[in-house]
Regions:
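Outer-membrane beta-barrel "beta-signal"
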Residues: 146-153, 171-184
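C-terminal outer-membrane beta-barrel translocator/porin domains of Gram-negative envelope proteins
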Residues: 1-113, 121-125, 129-131, 177-184
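Short flexible coil/turn linkers enriched for glycine and charged/polar residues
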Residues: 113-115, 153
Length: 184
């Protein structure tokens, strides 16, 4: 490229959120007052077209909440184009955990107790594929749970407790977030 790069690929990302207020308790009807309730839906998708093999940080990871695409109920980076693999598994190389296409959705019922504190119930679903042409909505991994978020002077902190439905041993996973997460 004209900036000295050797890559010949295009990375496309898209996301959208839709939130609907569904009620308020207290606050005398004033905006931002009392306890507020909302329903939200967030969709995210991304794809890499071309050869990004030499550029792993332009490809996608999925699972957990800290790296790559969020999917609560699963350990970090355990959702792969080849299926679910535990971290440090000898059955898959780290580079094979990356995909060139992903899709995720989150449905959430959020409860804002104040401008600094929120609670929520959520349902996440997502998938990761080697190639955008492999995308199929029938192969999404699912998680659901409860979460809380507090806004501090250092940024938002969150705690989510999520159930991963599609793991070899389905079960609960605790996630700690140190950045802006889903909704709430």
């Amino acid at each position: 490229g004209f900036l000295g790069g050797d890559g010949n690929f295009t990375r496309v990302l898209g996301d959208g959120s839709f939130w609907v207020p569904v009620g308020q308790v207290g606050g005398d009807g004033n905006p931002g007052g009392g306890i507020r309730f909302a329903l939200g839906l967030t969709l995210r998708a991304g794809a890499v077209f071309g050869d990004a093999g030499a550029f792993p940080f332009d490809r996608f990871w999925m699972g957990g909440v800290q790296f790559g695409q969020q999917l609560r109920g699963y350990d970090e980076t355990t959702v792969t184009p080849l299926g679910l693999y535990p971290r440090r598994s000898a059955e898959i190389s780290e580079i094979d955990r990356l995909g060139d296409a992903f899709f995720s959705l989150t449905a959430e019922y959020a409860i804002r107790l104040s401008d600094q504190l929120g609670l929520g119930l959520f349902y996440d679903a997502g998938g990761l594929w080697r190639d955008p042409s492999e995308f199929t909505p029938q192969n999404l991994y699912r998680g659901a749970g409860v979460g809380m978020q507090i806004v501090t002077p250092f940024g938002p902190l969150g705690l989510d407790y999520a159930y991963g439905f599609d793991k070899a041993s389905p079960g609960w996973k605790l996630h700690f977030r140190m950045a802006q997460g889903q909704g709430m």
